[in-house]
Amino acid sequence: MLGAISGQLLVVAIYWIYFKNTPDDPGAILACFSTGDALDNKLNGFVTEFIDTAILGFIAMGLYRGMFFKQSIDIANIGIGLVITALVMAGGGPTGPALNPARDLGPRIVHAILPIPNKGGSNWGYSWIPVVATTLGCILGIWLYKISFGL
């Protein structure tokens, strides 16, 4: 979580002047910090985060536990980067996926604490979704891998 907060502080430093010049769209400012469903539909946001993270957990287990990649961790790391890219491109439209609880929660805390110009609320009513859905989704993905291939 400290990495997510530190990274978000760098984003704030880079975009501060743009936040000052975005008076009519606090939602656009929040989108630089955290995820949220495009239609403000919590069920859709939960399902999207859950499925995307289940896929990530399943594939990560395959990359790091599969016979081919055990000897070549660097290839597995590249594979994870490509999987995350594909998940963001394919399933990221509805929510701008978190895929990780810290990716949403840390920056949302930064948004809530800092006196950012023209910001609105931090949408805490949605904040539980990227935490719970990603955790449960990853557990399901790992469980499906273990059932399918064992460890």
Predicted features and spans:
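Membrane-interface helix-loop junctions and terminal tails of multi-pass membrane proteins
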Residues: 1-151
